[in-house]
Swiss-Prot record:
Name recorded for this polypeptide: 1-(5-phosphoribosyl)-5-[(5-phosphoribosylamino)methylideneamino] imidazole-4-carboxamide isomerase
Source superkingdom: Bacteria
Main location: cytoplasm
Pathway: Amino-acid biosynthesis; L-histidine biosynthesis; L-histidine from 5-phospho-alpha-D-ribose 1-diphosphate: step 4/9
Entry GO CC: cytoplasm
Matching Gene3D superfamilies: Aldolase class I (3.20.20.70)
Alphabetically ordered keywords of this record: Amino-acid biosynthesis, Cytoplasm, Histidine biosynthesis, Isomerase
Cell cycle among keywords: no
GO molecular function: 1-(5-phosphoribosyl)-5-[(5-phosphoribosylamino)methylideneamino]imidazole-4-carboxamide isomerase activity
Gene assigned in the entry: hisA
Length: 245
């Protein structure tokens, strides 16, 4: 089970949001590259970056910070990034810059042709982020709720060749209220590609519950507020996950 530290970028700083609200952000670091190194030193095997400004603007807005992280990480571990990725040129720029995976969210839902083209041009590098509330997909930095069901969309995207799905329960994100295990397992069981859990990780109990069901197709979990607030010791959690197989 991959425990993947999240580095959310707003105005060049590392922050955490509550339920995706840009007005409810807490700054955890002024130096994104140093934050990346901190998690690598703690045993991270992948990093999850989010360009929060970019997600709302529809274009990269924290490229300087992202570039500094990629330079710091080098070939140590893979890095994945979401937020503001709406065209093939942006994907190419990021992958050429050292990014392993790009995460397409809103654009996958609103512009499926773009996702198809991205999977065709950059096979193995495309992850789709599906953010949902009550089983329905949300877009535009979580500000708009669609009528699309998570499982139906994920199955379609799987057919197009996406590498994996990141499933975020918006109602729990940044709330330390526990991962929505049942919904994550249900999605993983409906797919043959891996699912990465996200939203609400609160502590070691969540890690143990996810590890217990990882054979259903759950590859990892995004670790956000819990590892910044001290509710979860990242190194200890990764060690526990390894111990559980």
């Amino acid at each position: 089970m991959l425990l993947i530290p999240a580095i959310d970028l707003k105005d060049g700083h590392c922050v955490r949001l509550r339920q995706g609200d840009m007005d409810q952000s807490t700054t955890f670091g002024e130096n994104p590259a140093a934050m990346a190194r901190q998690w690598i030193d703690a045993g991270a095997r992948r990093l999850h970056l989010v360009d929060l400004n970019g997600a709302l603007a529809g274009m990269p807005k924290n490229y300087g910070a992202i570039k500094s992280i990629l330079k710091e990480v080098g070939d140590d571990i893979p890095v994945q990034l979401g937020g503001g990725i709406r065209d093939l040129d942006t994907i190419e720029k990021y992958i050429d810059g050292g990014l392993r995976y790009v995460i397409i969210g809103t654009a996958a839902v609103k512009n499926p042709g773009f996702l198809k083209d991205a999977c065709s041009a950059f096979g193995g590098h495309i992850i789709v982020g599906l953010d949902a509330r009550d089983g329905k997909v949300a877009t535009d930095g979580w500000s708009k709720l669609t009528g699309h069901g998570v499982v139906d969309l994920a199955r379609k995207f799987e057919d197009w060749g996406v590498e994996s799905i990141i499933y975020t329960d918006i109602g729990r994100d940044g709330m330390l209220s526990g991962i929505n295990i049942d919904a994550t397992v249900a999605l993983a069981q409906a797919l043959s590609i891996p699912v990465i859990a996200s939203g609400g990780l609160s502590g070691m109990a969540d890690i143990e519950q996810l590890c217990a069901v990882q054979d259903e197709g759950i590859e990892g979990v995004i670790c956000g507020r819990a590892i910044y607030s001290g509710d979860l010791d990242f190194a200890a959690a990764q060690a526990r996950a390894d111990e559980m197989g």
